[in-house]
Amino acid sequence: MKKEFMSRALLLAKKAYEAGEVPVGAVIVKDGEIIAEGYNMREQKQNALSHAEIECINKACEVLKSWRLETCELYVTLEPCPMCTGAIINSRIKTVVFGAYDLKAGSMDSVINLCDYPYNHKPEIYGGIMEDECKEILEIFFQKLR
């Protein structure tokens, strides 16, 4: 687990922020190298599925020419929601590292841990990595909306 990967995800969250999106960024790492990046694009694409994790998983699948990401790690600035957790399970991602906990929709710890259910795959999960930095950009974004 490397902070440099979470730092890169945080830079992508800032890109999302600048685009008027909920500031969440993600990277997928294989063999110590970033192979895919993504950030929230729901407003830009007008697509409810365009969360950072989904964007990133789609790109990683294209790069590897496979839907199986079992040797990959996902770094994301916010705890994944139910949809993204399902995509993580289905794509067999080995490890998930997230920053801020999501008390409203977090599905790896905060609200529910979908990975505790007897699905066919269970990733390793590490939460609260660079939590303050990841939480801060979200707080600023939502304060501006009010």
Residues covered by each model-derived region:
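Short glycine-enriched, charge-decorated loop/helix-capping segments at active-site entrances
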Residues: 40-46, 112
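Helix-adjacent hinge/juxtasegments
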Residues: 46-50, 54, 58-87
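Short beta-strand scaffold segments in enzyme catalytic cores
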Residues: 24-32
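Residues that line or immediately flank small-molecule/substrate-binding pockets and catalytic motifs
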Residues: 42, 76, 100
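Short, basic and Ser/Thr-rich N-terminal targeting/leader segments
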Residues: 20-24, 70
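Short beta->alpha transition motifs characteristic of CBS
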Residues: 35-42, 122
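Zinc-dependent deaminase
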Residues: 1-19, 67, 80-146
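Small-residue (primarily alanine) positions within well-ordered alpha-helices
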Residues: 9, 13-16, 26, 36, ...
